[in-house]
Amino acid sequence: MERSHLPETPFDLAHSGPRFQAQSSGNGSVLDNVLPDMAHLVNPYWSRFAPMDPMMSKILGLFTLAIMIISCCGNGVVVYIFGGTKSLRTPANLLVLNLAFSDFCMMASQSPVMIINFYYETWVLGPLWCDIYAGCGSLFGCVSIWSMCMIAFDRYNVIVKGINGTPMTIKTSIMKILFIWMMAVFWTVMPLIGWSAYVPEGNLTACSIDYMTRMWNPRSYLITYSLFVYYTPLFLICYSYWFIIAAVAAHEKAMREQAKKMNVKSLRSSEDCDKSAEGKLAKVALTTISLWFMAWTPYLVICYFGLFKIDGLTPLTTIWGATFAKTSAVYNPIVYGISHPKYRIVLKEKCPMCVFGNTDEPKPDAPASDTETTSEADSKA
Protein backbone atom coordinates (compact mmCIF):
# COMPACT_ATOMS: atom_id res chain seq x y z
CA MET A 1 0.00 0.00 0.00
CA GLU A 2 1.36 3.41 -0.96
CA ARG A 3 2.02 5.72 1.95
CA SER A 4 2.55 9.44 2.27
CA HIS A 5 6.15 10.65 2.14
CA LEU A 6 7.50 13.75 3.78
CA PRO A 7 10.96 15.27 3.42
CA GLU A 8 13.43 14.44 6.12
CA THR A 9 13.88 17.12 8.76
CA PRO A 10 16.95 18.07 10.81
CA PHE A 11 15.13 16.99 13.96
CA ASP A 12 17.06 15.28 16.76
CA LEU A 13 16.29 14.22 20.32
CA ALA A 14 18.57 16.84 21.78
CA HIS A 15 16.14 19.52 20.62
CA SER A 16 12.91 17.66 21.30
CA GLY A 17 10.51 17.61 24.19
CA PRO A 18 10.47 20.36 26.80
CA ARG A 19 13.73 21.77 25.42
CA PHE A 20 12.43 22.28 21.90
CA GLN A 21 11.88 26.04 21.86
CA ALA A 22 10.08 26.12 18.52
CA GLN A 23 7.16 24.38 20.17
CA SER A 24 6.27 27.49 22.12
CA SER A 25 6.84 29.97 19.32
CA GLY A 26 3.42 29.43 17.79
CA ASN A 27 4.98 28.88 14.33
CA GLY A 28 5.61 25.81 12.26
CA SER A 29 3.81 22.50 12.01
CA VAL A 30 3.29 19.48 14.22
CA LEU A 31 5.47 17.66 11.69
CA ASP A 32 8.47 19.91 12.27
CA ASN A 33 9.86 17.61 14.95
CA VAL A 34 9.04 14.25 13.39
CA LEU A 35 12.07 11.96 13.22
CA PRO A 36 13.40 11.14 9.72
CA ASP A 37 12.72 7.42 10.04
CA MET A 38 9.05 8.13 10.80
CA ALA A 39 8.45 10.86 8.21
CA HIS A 40 7.30 8.51 5.46
CA LEU A 41 4.55 7.11 7.73
CA VAL A 42 2.94 10.45 8.63
CA ASN A 43 -0.08 11.64 6.67
CA PRO A 44 0.37 15.15 5.14
CA TYR A 45 -3.03 16.15 6.56
CA TRP A 46 -1.40 16.81 9.94
CA SER A 47 1.01 19.41 8.49
CA ARG A 48 -1.68 22.09 8.74
CA PHE A 49 -1.67 21.97 12.55
CA ALA A 50 0.66 23.77 14.93
CA PRO A 51 2.61 21.74 17.52
CA MET A 52 0.66 20.70 20.60
CA ASP A 53 1.17 22.85 23.68
CA PRO A 54 3.98 21.32 25.80
CA MET A 55 1.79 21.76 28.88
CA MET A 56 -0.86 19.55 27.31
CA SER A 57 1.78 16.88 26.72
CA LYS A 58 2.66 16.99 30.42
CA ILE A 59 -1.01 16.74 31.41
CA LEU A 60 -1.55 13.78 29.10
CA GLY A 61 1.61 12.13 30.41
CA LEU A 62 0.50 12.47 34.03
CA PHE A 63 -3.01 11.27 33.20
CA THR A 64 -1.60 8.24 31.40
CA LEU A 65 0.69 7.49 34.35
CA ALA A 66 -2.26 7.68 36.75
CA ILE A 67 -4.52 5.32 34.79
CA MET A 68 -1.59 2.94 34.25
CA ILE A 69 -0.98 2.65 38.00
CA ILE A 70 -4.69 2.25 38.80
CA SER A 71 -5.30 -0.26 36.02
CA CYS A 72 -2.20 -2.38 36.57
CA CYS A 73 -2.84 -2.54 40.32
CA GLY A 74 -6.56 -3.25 39.93
CA ASN A 75 -6.22 -5.85 37.20
CA GLY A 76 -3.14 -7.34 38.83
CA VAL A 77 -5.11 -7.93 42.02
CA VAL A 78 -8.00 -9.46 40.05
CA VAL A 79 -5.60 -11.85 38.29
CA TYR A 80 -3.94 -12.73 41.61
CA ILE A 81 -7.23 -13.35 43.44
CA PHE A 82 -9.05 -15.27 40.71
CA GLY A 83 -5.96 -17.15 39.56
CA GLY A 84 -4.67 -17.98 43.03
CA THR A 85 -7.94 -19.01 44.67
CA LYS A 86 -9.13 -22.49 43.72
CA SER A 87 -12.74 -21.85 44.69
CA LEU A 88 -12.89 -18.89 42.29
CA ARG A 89 -11.47 -20.73 39.28
CA THR A 90 -14.91 -21.49 37.84
CA PRO A 91 -15.66 -21.57 34.09
CA ALA A 92 -17.35 -18.15 34.22
CA ASN A 93 -14.54 -16.62 36.27
CA LEU A 94 -11.95 -17.77 33.73
CA LEU A 95 -13.50 -15.23 31.38
CA VAL A 96 -13.17 -12.54 34.04
CA LEU A 97 -9.56 -13.62 34.56
CA ASN A 98 -8.93 -13.36 30.81
CA LEU A 99 -10.45 -9.88 30.77
CA ALA A 100 -8.28 -8.71 33.67
CA PHE A 101 -5.15 -10.19 32.08
CA SER A 102 -5.76 -8.48 28.73
CA ASP A 103 -6.50 -5.16 30.44
CA PHE A 104 -3.30 -5.46 32.47
CA CYS A 105 -1.29 -6.18 29.31
CA MET A 106 -3.00 -3.32 27.50
CA MET A 107 -1.84 -0.73 30.01
CA ALA A 108 1.57 -2.34 30.59
CA SER A 109 2.34 -2.29 26.85
CA GLN A 110 0.79 1.08 25.97
CA SER A 111 1.27 3.52 28.82
CA PRO A 112 5.10 3.48 29.21
CA VAL A 113 5.50 4.06 25.46
CA MET A 114 3.02 6.93 25.50
CA ILE A 115 4.69 8.56 28.50
CA ILE A 116 8.11 8.46 26.79
CA ASN A 117 6.71 10.05 23.64
CA PHE A 118 4.77 12.65 25.62
CA TYR A 119 8.07 13.73 27.17
CA TYR A 120 9.76 14.16 23.77
CA GLU A 121 6.51 15.39 22.18
CA THR A 122 6.93 13.09 19.19
CA TRP A 123 7.38 9.40 18.37
CA VAL A 124 11.01 8.59 19.19
CA LEU A 125 11.02 4.77 19.17
CA GLY A 126 11.08 4.12 15.44
CA PRO A 127 8.81 2.26 12.97
CA LEU A 128 9.27 -1.17 14.58
CA TRP A 129 7.99 -0.01 17.95
CA CYS A 130 5.17 1.82 16.18
CA ASP A 131 4.01 -1.55 14.82
CA ILE A 132 4.50 -3.27 18.20
CA TYR A 133 2.68 -0.54 20.12
CA ALA A 134 -0.28 -0.34 17.74
CA GLY A 135 -0.43 -4.12 17.41
CA CYS A 136 -0.56 -4.60 21.18
CA GLY A 137 -3.29 -1.99 21.46
CA SER A 138 -5.36 -3.76 18.82
CA LEU A 139 -4.68 -7.24 20.25
CA PHE A 140 -5.50 -6.55 23.89
CA GLY A 141 -8.36 -4.19 23.06
CA CYS A 142 -10.02 -6.86 20.93
CA VAL A 143 -9.49 -9.50 23.63
CA SER A 144 -11.01 -7.25 26.30
CA ILE A 145 -14.08 -6.34 24.26
CA TRP A 146 -14.84 -9.92 23.29
CA SER A 147 -14.20 -11.15 26.84
CA MET A 148 -16.88 -8.71 28.01
CA CYS A 149 -19.15 -10.08 25.31
CA MET A 150 -18.60 -13.70 26.40
CA ILE A 151 -19.22 -12.75 30.04
CA ALA A 152 -22.52 -11.13 29.08
CA PHE A 153 -23.54 -14.15 27.01
CA ASP A 154 -22.69 -16.51 29.88
CA ARG A 155 -24.95 -14.53 32.20
CA TYR A 156 -27.67 -14.68 29.57
CA ASN A 157 -27.29 -18.46 29.34
CA VAL A 158 -27.52 -18.97 33.12
CA ILE A 159 -30.16 -16.41 34.05
CA VAL A 160 -32.44 -16.36 31.00
CA LYS A 161 -32.24 -19.98 29.86
CA GLY A 162 -31.74 -21.38 33.35
CA ILE A 163 -31.97 -25.16 33.50
CA ASN A 164 -32.70 -25.24 29.77
CA GLY A 165 -29.31 -23.76 29.00
CA THR A 166 -26.12 -25.75 28.51
CA PRO A 167 -23.84 -25.22 31.54
CA MET A 168 -20.43 -23.84 30.68
CA THR A 169 -17.56 -26.15 31.63
CA ILE A 170 -13.87 -25.44 32.09
CA LYS A 171 -13.25 -26.89 28.64
CA THR A 172 -15.93 -24.70 27.07
CA SER A 173 -14.54 -21.63 28.79
CA ILE A 174 -11.01 -22.37 27.57
CA MET A 175 -12.31 -22.89 24.03
CA LYS A 176 -14.01 -19.50 24.16
CA ILE A 177 -10.82 -17.87 25.40
CA LEU A 178 -8.81 -19.51 22.61
CA PHE A 179 -11.35 -18.28 20.07
CA ILE A 180 -11.06 -14.74 21.45
CA TRP A 181 -7.26 -14.72 21.21
CA MET A 182 -7.17 -16.29 17.75
CA MET A 183 -9.59 -13.71 16.40
CA ALA A 184 -7.66 -10.88 18.08
CA VAL A 185 -4.37 -12.13 16.62
CA PHE A 186 -5.94 -12.25 13.15
CA TRP A 187 -7.05 -8.61 13.25
CA THR A 188 -3.70 -7.57 14.75
CA VAL A 189 -1.58 -9.27 12.09
CA MET A 190 -3.53 -8.02 9.06
CA PRO A 191 -2.03 -4.47 9.04
CA LEU A 192 1.44 -6.01 9.31
CA ILE A 193 1.02 -8.01 6.11
CA GLY A 194 -0.58 -5.37 3.91
CA TRP A 195 -4.24 -4.93 4.81
CA SER A 196 -4.05 -1.34 6.08
CA ALA A 197 -1.02 -0.34 8.17
CA TYR A 198 0.04 0.96 11.57
CA VAL A 199 1.01 4.64 11.40
CA PRO A 200 1.55 7.58 13.80
CA GLU A 201 -1.55 9.50 14.81
CA GLY A 202 -1.88 13.24 14.43
CA ASN A 203 -0.08 14.22 17.61
CA LEU A 204 2.83 11.88 16.73
CA THR A 205 2.98 10.39 20.24
CA ALA A 206 0.92 7.27 19.51
CA CYS A 207 0.41 4.83 16.65
CA SER A 208 -2.76 3.18 15.41
CA ILE A 209 -4.34 1.73 12.28
CA ASP A 210 -4.31 4.03 9.26
CA TYR A 211 -7.63 5.85 9.12
CA MET A 212 -6.46 8.89 7.12
CA THR A 213 -5.27 7.43 3.79
CA ARG A 214 -7.90 7.87 1.04
CA MET A 215 -7.56 4.37 -0.39
CA TRP A 216 -9.85 1.35 -0.38
CA ASN A 217 -7.28 -0.89 1.32
CA PRO A 218 -7.19 0.87 4.72
CA ARG A 219 -10.84 1.86 4.46
CA SER A 220 -12.01 -1.71 3.92
CA TYR A 221 -9.95 -2.87 6.90
CA LEU A 222 -11.35 -0.23 9.24
CA ILE A 223 -14.95 -0.89 8.19
CA THR A 224 -14.57 -4.66 8.58
CA TYR A 225 -12.59 -4.31 11.79
CA SER A 226 -15.21 -2.06 13.40
CA LEU A 227 -17.95 -4.49 12.33
CA PHE A 228 -16.35 -7.48 14.08
CA VAL A 229 -14.63 -5.71 16.99
CA TYR A 230 -17.22 -3.04 17.83
CA TYR A 231 -20.70 -3.51 16.41
CA THR A 232 -20.96 -7.29 16.81
CA PRO A 233 -19.91 -7.44 20.50
CA LEU A 234 -21.98 -4.32 21.16
CA PHE A 235 -25.08 -6.00 19.73
CA LEU A 236 -24.44 -9.21 21.71
CA ILE A 237 -23.88 -7.32 24.97
CA CYS A 238 -27.07 -5.27 24.54
CA TYR A 239 -29.03 -8.35 23.47
CA SER A 240 -27.85 -10.37 26.47
CA TYR A 241 -28.54 -7.72 29.09
CA TRP A 242 -31.91 -6.81 27.60
CA PHE A 243 -33.20 -10.34 28.14
CA ILE A 244 -31.39 -10.72 31.48
CA ILE A 245 -33.17 -7.70 32.91
CA ALA A 246 -36.48 -8.83 31.41
CA ALA A 247 -36.11 -12.33 32.89
CA VAL A 248 -35.18 -11.11 36.36
CA ALA A 249 -37.94 -8.51 36.30
CA ALA A 250 -40.44 -11.28 35.49
CA HIS A 251 -39.05 -13.35 38.35
CA GLU A 252 -39.37 -10.44 40.76
CA LYS A 253 -42.94 -9.85 39.61
CA ALA A 254 -43.79 -13.51 40.16
CA MET A 255 -42.36 -13.34 43.69
CA ARG A 256 -44.44 -10.27 44.50
CA GLU A 257 -47.60 -11.96 43.21
CA GLN A 258 -46.81 -15.08 45.23
CA ALA A 259 -46.33 -12.94 48.31
CA LYS A 260 -49.80 -11.45 47.81
CA LYS A 261 -51.34 -14.91 47.55
CA MET A 262 -49.61 -15.90 50.79
CA ASN A 263 -50.92 -12.69 52.37
CA VAL A 264 -47.42 -11.48 53.26
CA LYS A 265 -45.75 -8.26 52.31
CA SER A 266 -42.81 -9.89 50.59
CA LEU A 267 -40.93 -13.13 50.26
CA ARG A 268 -37.75 -11.13 50.82
CA SER A 269 -36.44 -9.59 53.99
CA SER A 270 -36.39 -6.23 52.21
CA GLU A 271 -37.95 -4.67 49.14
CA ASP A 272 -34.98 -2.39 48.69
CA CYS A 273 -34.33 -2.35 44.93
CA ASP A 274 -30.61 -1.86 45.44
CA LYS A 275 -30.48 -5.21 47.23
CA SER A 276 -32.73 -7.08 44.82
CA ALA A 277 -31.47 -9.17 41.95
CA GLU A 278 -33.34 -6.96 39.51
CA GLY A 279 -31.71 -3.81 40.83
CA LYS A 280 -28.24 -5.34 40.84
CA LEU A 281 -28.52 -6.70 37.33
CA ALA A 282 -29.93 -3.45 36.01
CA LYS A 283 -27.03 -1.54 37.53
CA VAL A 284 -24.41 -3.93 36.18
CA ALA A 285 -26.01 -3.90 32.72
CA LEU A 286 -26.27 -0.12 32.61
CA THR A 287 -22.76 0.35 33.97
CA THR A 288 -21.22 -2.17 31.61
CA ILE A 289 -22.82 -0.87 28.43
CA SER A 290 -22.44 2.80 29.37
CA LEU A 291 -18.74 2.52 30.21
CA TRP A 292 -18.17 0.46 27.09
CA PHE A 293 -19.77 3.19 25.00
CA MET A 294 -17.94 5.96 26.84
CA ALA A 295 -14.52 4.36 26.43
CA TRP A 296 -14.56 3.17 22.82
CA THR A 297 -17.16 5.17 20.90
CA PRO A 298 -15.24 8.49 20.84
CA TYR A 299 -12.22 6.79 19.30
CA LEU A 300 -14.34 5.00 16.69
CA VAL A 301 -15.92 8.35 15.79
CA ILE A 302 -12.42 9.82 15.37
CA CYS A 303 -11.48 6.97 13.04
CA TYR A 304 -14.64 7.51 11.00
CA PHE A 305 -13.92 11.25 10.81
CA GLY A 306 -10.66 10.41 9.08
CA LEU A 307 -12.21 7.63 7.01
CA PHE A 308 -14.95 9.83 5.54
CA LYS A 309 -12.94 13.08 5.27
CA ILE A 310 -14.96 14.92 7.89
CA ASP A 311 -13.46 18.25 8.96
CA GLY A 312 -12.66 18.93 12.59
CA LEU A 313 -10.10 16.23 13.28
CA THR A 314 -7.09 17.63 15.15
CA PRO A 315 -3.99 16.07 16.75
CA LEU A 316 -5.39 16.88 20.18
CA THR A 317 -8.68 15.08 19.57
CA THR A 318 -6.89 11.97 18.29
CA ILE A 319 -4.67 11.61 21.33
CA TRP A 320 -7.46 12.27 23.83
CA GLY A 321 -9.62 9.71 22.02
CA ALA A 322 -6.84 7.12 22.11
CA THR A 323 -6.07 7.84 25.76
CA PHE A 324 -9.71 7.79 26.86
CA ALA A 325 -10.33 4.45 25.13
CA LYS A 326 -7.68 2.90 27.36
CA THR A 327 -9.59 3.92 30.49
CA SER A 328 -11.83 0.90 29.88
CA ALA A 329 -8.99 -1.08 31.44
CA VAL A 330 -9.62 0.86 34.67
CA TYR A 331 -13.40 0.31 34.72
CA ASN A 332 -13.42 -3.43 34.12
CA PRO A 333 -11.83 -4.67 37.37
CA ILE A 334 -14.38 -2.60 39.27
CA VAL A 335 -17.41 -3.83 37.32
CA TYR A 336 -16.41 -7.48 36.98
CA GLY A 337 -14.19 -8.01 39.99
CA ILE A 338 -15.11 -5.80 42.92
CA SER A 339 -18.86 -6.34 42.32
CA HIS A 340 -18.30 -10.10 42.70
CA PRO A 341 -19.27 -11.00 46.31
CA LYS A 342 -16.95 -14.01 46.65
CA TYR A 343 -14.09 -12.00 45.17
CA ARG A 344 -14.60 -9.34 47.83
CA ILE A 345 -14.54 -11.97 50.58
CA VAL A 346 -11.23 -13.43 49.38
CA LEU A 347 -9.79 -9.96 48.81
CA LYS A 348 -10.68 -8.99 52.37
CA GLU A 349 -8.85 -12.08 53.66
CA LYS A 350 -5.69 -11.38 51.65
CA CYS A 351 -5.74 -7.58 51.65
CA PRO A 352 -8.19 -6.13 54.21
CA MET A 353 -7.25 -2.53 53.41
CA CYS A 354 -8.37 -3.01 49.79
CA VAL A 355 -12.02 -3.67 50.68
CA PHE A 356 -14.56 -1.07 51.73
CA GLY A 357 -18.03 -1.78 53.03
CA ASN A 358 -19.68 -5.01 54.07
CA THR A 359 -18.56 -8.25 52.40
CA ASP A 360 -21.28 -10.43 53.90
CA GLU A 361 -23.72 -11.77 51.37
CA PRO A 362 -27.37 -10.93 52.12
CA LYS A 363 -29.47 -13.78 53.45
CA PRO A 364 -33.09 -13.07 52.62
CA ASP A 365 -35.91 -14.82 54.38
CA ALA A 366 -37.34 -16.76 51.47
CA PRO A 367 -38.21 -20.31 50.54
CA ALA A 368 -35.23 -22.43 49.61
CA SER A 369 -36.09 -22.59 45.92
CA ASP A 370 -36.58 -18.83 45.62
CA THR A 371 -33.45 -18.06 47.59
CA GLU A 372 -31.37 -20.42 45.48
CA THR A 373 -32.60 -18.86 42.25
CA THR A 374 -32.07 -15.33 43.47
CA SER A 375 -28.64 -16.07 44.89
CA GLU A 376 -27.59 -17.58 41.60
CA ALA A 377 -28.71 -14.48 39.76
CA ASP A 378 -27.03 -12.19 42.29
CA SER A 379 -23.73 -14.02 42.03
CA LYS A 380 -23.82 -13.68 38.27
CA ALA A 381 -24.38 -9.96 38.53
UniProtKB/Swiss-Prot annotation:
GO terms for biological process: G protein-coupled receptor signaling pathway; phototransduction; visual perception. Residues 82-93, 154-172, 249-283, 340-381 are cytoplasmic. It is a multi-pass membrane protein. Predominant opsin expressed in the dorsal ocelli. Phosphorylated on some or all of the serine and threonine residues present in the C-terminal region. Residues 1-56, 120-133, 197-220, 308-314 are extracellular. The chain crosses the membrane at residues 57-81, 94-119, 134-153, 173-196, 221-248, 284-307, 315-339. Keywords: Chromophore, Disulfide bond, G-protein coupled receptor, Glycoprotein, Membrane, Phosphoprotein, Photoreceptor protein, Receptor, Retinal protein, Sensory transduction, Transducer, Transmembrane, Transmembrane helix, Vision. GO terms for cellular component: membrane; plasma membrane. The keyword Membrane applies. Residues 370-381 have a biased composition (Polar residues). It is found in: Membrane. Glycans are attached at residue 27. Belongs to the G-protein coupled receptor 1 family. Opsin subfamily. Visual pigments are the light-absorbing molecules that mediate vision. They consist of an apoprotein, opsin, covalently linked to cis-retinal. PANTHER family: OPSIN. This is Opsin Rh2. It comes from Drosophila melanogaster (Fruit fly).
